[in-house]
Swiss-Prot record:
GO molecular function, one term: single-stranded DNA binding
Physiological role: Involved in the packaging of pre-mRNA into hnRNP particles, transport of poly(A) mRNA from the nucleus to the cytoplasm and modulation of splice site selection. Plays a role in the splicing of pyruvate kinase PKM by binding repressively to sequences flanking PKM exon 9, inhibiting exon 9 inclusion and resulting in exon 10 inclusion and production of the PKM M2 isoform. Binds to the IRES and thereby inhibits the translation of the apoptosis protease activating factor APAF1. May bind to specific miRNA hairpins.
Keyword DNA repair: no
Record SUPFAM superfamilies: RNA-binding domain, RBD (SSF54928)
Glycyl lysine isopeptide (Lys-Gly) (interchain with G-Cter in SUMO) crosslink, residue number(s): 113
Region annotated Globular A domain, chain positions: 4-94
Chain segments carrying region RNA-binding RGG-box: 218-240
Biological-process GO terms, alphabetical: alternative mRNA splicing, via spliceosome; cellular response to glucose starvation; cellular response to sodium arsenite; import into nucleus; mRNA transport; negative regulation of telomere maintenance via telomerase; nuclear export; positive regulation of telomere maintenance via telomerase
Region of interest called Nuclear targeting sequence, as start-end residue ranges on this chain: 268-305
Domain RRM: 14-97, 105-184
Pfam annotation, one family: RRM_1
Designated name of the protein: Heterogeneous nuclear ribonucleoprotein A1
Amino acid sequence: MSKSESPKEPEQLRKLFIGGLSFETTDESLRSHFEQWGTLTDCVVMRDPNTKRSRGFGFVTYATVEEVDAAMNARPHKVDGRVVEPKRAVSREDSQRPGAHLTVKKIFVGGIKEDTEEHHLRDYFEQYGKIEVIEIMTDRGSGKKRGFAFVTFDDHDSVDKIVIQKYHTVNGHNCEVRKALSKQEMASASSSQRGRSGSGNFGGGRGGGFGGNDNFGRGGNFSGRGGFGGSRGGGGYGGSGDGYNGFGNDGSNFGGGGSYNDFGNYNNQSSNFGPMKGGNFGGRSSGPYGGGGQYFAKPRNQGGYGGSSSSSSYGSGRRF
């Protein structure tokens, strides 16, 4: 594809992670299947750099987001006789967040203003899929809105599409959106991340493949209830009115402790809004999948998946 024909939409939004591949699946057979829904600008089955054995997952990149949507709407997919699981690819930066790879149907929406009603949330988020439930959280005692809400969809892909797009405006105001995790999911994801010491469930270390020794679909990484549980300290929402603490103890935007107080204000936390650090979407010159991070492949000329993250084109620093 020439530069003049390069897609205008960020590559990150046009890419699908394909898990659960047969070890017999090749780049060609993967391409043959997924090009039914659009033009593929890249397609790769990830392999061990030494043995060349498939790691059981790959990536396909479409020319447009519309084609990605078409492919996701055509689920389930079967490649070489095996049902595979396509998911919207998570950037290396976002993959550092606990629960980034969990499959959930509920989102947390923070920073919403007091005059925001259910219809404002519905009007905005229904473009991403069918909404089942909208909950605007209020203080049990005073009934005052607490500045955050939960939206539950009928399909996890709606959530995945929302969270990779970063910036959302509801009722004229920017808001923060995250996957809503149960207390158990948050604790499990946090402990799992600490235990891995950076090698990552989706690669990271040179020896790591997807799921660290082909754990795809077994460790609960792609399952899990929606819902929300609160911080490891037992905070949560409701109870004694201690605010939304679910993301507090991991150094996220939502602060340490009670990120949102009962008036729905940020507690001296800076926002993510503004220019993205480090050029999160990178460029084609850095290879089809940017740096050596989780859920992403290294440029092919650097051999394989995982390994060093020093060449990453997906920014730096954790925001969760």
